[in-house]
Amino acid sequence: MAKLKKHPTGTIAQNKKARHDYFIEHKFEAGLVLSGWEVKSLRATKVQLVDSYVLLKDGEAWLMGCHITPLKTASTHVIADPTRTRKLLLNQRELEKLTSSVQQKGYACVALSIYWKQHLIKCEIALGKGKKEYDKRHTERERDSDRELQRAVRTKGKDD
């Protein structure tokens, strides 16, 4: 059997849309409660975090909207629900901080990435404030100007 290529940082999936839609203020590392077929699918990077968010309810954190596609070779006697809610494991102090911040207007808790940390699967969640449309355009303009500046620096070095 051929070895699977491992991503150098251990990152399984990223939610780039969350970084585009929110000003990220605080990041937290949370463990995930998963079943066996989900771990196999995550090894094969069959996960999407695009519309995922964190729901804080009854002193617990739940990952909603995360889609983990079951593998064809997964167990047939277990009914796989790709979009089920998954429990996030956080310290009580972190949960209290998230709960108090989310109750403020404009703040949301979103999943940024899922990655390997040694043999465990972790989820990076973030507390963010929603961006307005003009903020998104401003960020895009800054990124474009930085890219142009880098190009100019590179071409100036080649002319010498």
From Swiss-Prot:
Cellular compartment(s): Cytoplasm
* Keyword Phosphoprotein carried by entry: no
Keyword Cytoplasm attached:
yes
Extract the NCBIfam families matched here.
PRK05422.1, smpB
Q: What is this protein called?
A: SsrA-binding protein
The coding gene here is: smpB
Positions of the region Disordered?
131-160
**What are the TM regions of this chain, as residue ranges?**
none
| Pfam families listed in its UniProt record | SmpB
Give me any GO biological process, just one: trans-translation
> InterPro entries given for it?
SmpB (IPR023620), SsrA-bd_prot (IPR000037), SsrA-bd_prot_CS (IPR020081)
Q: What does this protein do?
A: Required for rescue of stalled ribosomes mediated by trans-translation. Binds to transfer-messenger RNA (tmRNA), required for stable association of tmRNA with ribosomes. tmRNA and SmpB together mimic tRNA shape, replacing the anticodon stem-loop with SmpB. tmRNA is encoded by the ssrA gene; the 2 termini fold to resemble tRNA(Ala) and it encodes a 'tag peptide', a short internal open reading frame. During trans-translation Ala-aminoacylated tmRNA acts like a tRNA, entering the A-site of stalled ribosomes, displacing the stalled mRNA.
- UniProt keyword annotations, A-Z: Cytoplasm, RNA-binding
